[in-house]
Amino acid sequence: MSIPKGPSLAVLPMADNGASTAGPQILQPSGWPAPKGYANGVAADGRIVVTGGVIGWNTLGHLPADFVAQVRQALSNIAAILAEGGARPEHLVRLTWYVVDIEEYLANLKILGQAYREIFGTHYPAMALVQVVRLVEKAARVEIEATAVVPR
């Protein structure tokens, strides 16, 4: 039996903030360039916390018109949902972003990165960005789904 040869895989531990050492691990195939602002893959073992699609409205149901403000609030909302489930930002294993205008996202990438780090720190899970025609909430410019795994 022949085993196909492919790239070897590096499994790197994530930053330890005093949490369990059994937390998520970054999956980075050997020889691949290091990603910036996301992970190529994440492996984790524990209790799964999943959000629905989260938009940038506040507790009063107000949705700002500004794209960056919507992203900042959506990320804050995700942090609140994670906390409700006993998860912290370092437990994130996946974020899927849905935007109505990818050019708007790219034009604001630097400030979006700053907002992300203010809320989640420098932990970057696996991420995907998808442009859509529109979101259910017509005024929403971004919707984000999150998955976290809390170590046992």
Give the positions of each predicted feature.
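N-terminal presequence-like segments and the immediate start of the first folded domain
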Residues: S2-V93, V99-R152
